[in-house]
Amino acid sequence: TLQDILDMNMKKLATLVSAVALSATVSANAMAKDTIALVVSTLNNPFFVSLKDGAQKEADKLGYNLVVLDSQNNPAKELANVQDLTVRGTKILLINPTDSDAVGNAVKMANQANIPVITLDRQATKGEVVSHIASDNVLGGKIAGDYIAKKAGEGAKVIELQGIAGTSAARERGEGFQQAVAAHKFNVLASQPADFDRTKGLNVMQNLLTAHPDVQAVFAQNDEMALGALRALQTAGKSDVMVVGFDGTPDGEKAVNDGKLAATIAQLPDQIGAKGVETADKVLKGEKVQAKYPVDLKLVVKQ
């Protein structure tokens, strides 16, 4: 009868529905168990692509599936990415913030969903984070100063171009450089901000050269300012003044290899990504992790 056929179809449908429900649960659990989520500020910058590649390699090694979402340097997109991941039942979140303040909302959203958060490269000023992984900027500043001492000698006359006041990078790199200043008894002629900017680096350096023509070495807290300072020195015919940058950007490393920049302190973004996944693995296994993991840097000089 028609009723029998309907009953049979309903039974089939019920079986089908429960099968679908079961597979949905299984896939949610599979995602939750073996997946680490990584939200990157932008994949339009080689630095962060390296960070992602390092994370991917470590995830493959440890047997995790890595889900990567790109925030396209937009805090609203970043928040949407994190919301998407909380709905998907992510067990742990690695986030490289678009902005230290703006990321607070995304971190708090993950906190409310009881998802542990690990920040990479940039810190979050709000919300709870289990661990922060970034380059050891203090050590980098000291390495730069030590190299200047090696080449220009103890007691060298130096100028420091500082980054944007208030940023952790400028504060920490400056602190490390000050350690070298004390150790090598440098005569610091001037320390002035040029806001991590190439044009400002050029202008500030031109002004400082007028006041301090006897400078022997310049430490710029990033490669952009270093390249600006280099231009000012070239224009003034002072090619004997050594300039040391920081970051190891493609332009910075090229200037080192061309013999223009004395050195740059390169960050290792792939290691930041790898350390992030390694730390996530520990958190998922219930092991204790440090609140902060400093990642090594390397001195790049002409080969």
What are these regions (language model features)?
Residues 4-15, 22, 26, 30-303:
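A residue-level marker of the well-folded mature domains of exported/periplasmic proteins
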